[in-house]
Amino acid sequence: MLQSIMDIVADIMKQVATGDNLSQISKSVGGDEKGVQSALSMGIPMLLGSMSDTTSKPGGADMITGMLGQMGGSNPMDNLGSFLGSPTSSTGGSSMVSSLLGSQMVPIQNAISQKSGLPPAIVGKVLAIAAPMVMGYVGKMFAGQKMDQKGLTSLIGDQSKMAMQSSPDAANMAKQMLGSQQETAKATGFFKKIFGK
């Protein structure tokens, strides 16, 4: 049975809070622990939402499976301490975040910055660490399963909505950004997809 992404969000946050993991992340990105924890709790659902939007587009599922392939079957959460201690822990994550969020990357960083109190640049570093964690978990979910486009799109789409429901701050932030985009007549499908609109 595939594991719920909502459970994955909770599990990531639980493991981050274990031992000195949160301290390691905070030192790595140069932010305070409270702000980093807040940024992660909002950033992870937003990354899942972007994955949902990506898989719904032509070629999007192939892009996600390609990212999963780059992980080589590894899951940072299997040994979080070792992953965080690696000097390259966020290197691959930066390209993942850029590919997933695209033009929405800066608005999302700014929105999380306002909520968490961290500078946007620090939020970007937090997302770069979070992305491999999320991708590793998605890969783990499909271990031994047939990962076709329909299955990937359906699972991530449904579970990204559940992840948003588990994070009111992220959901409110996304709704505010959707409203802002609609007002300026530049709305994309990114946030609409998250809320099934």
Q: In which residue ranges do the predicted regions lie?
A:
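A structural "flexibility-hinge" signal
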Residues: 1-197
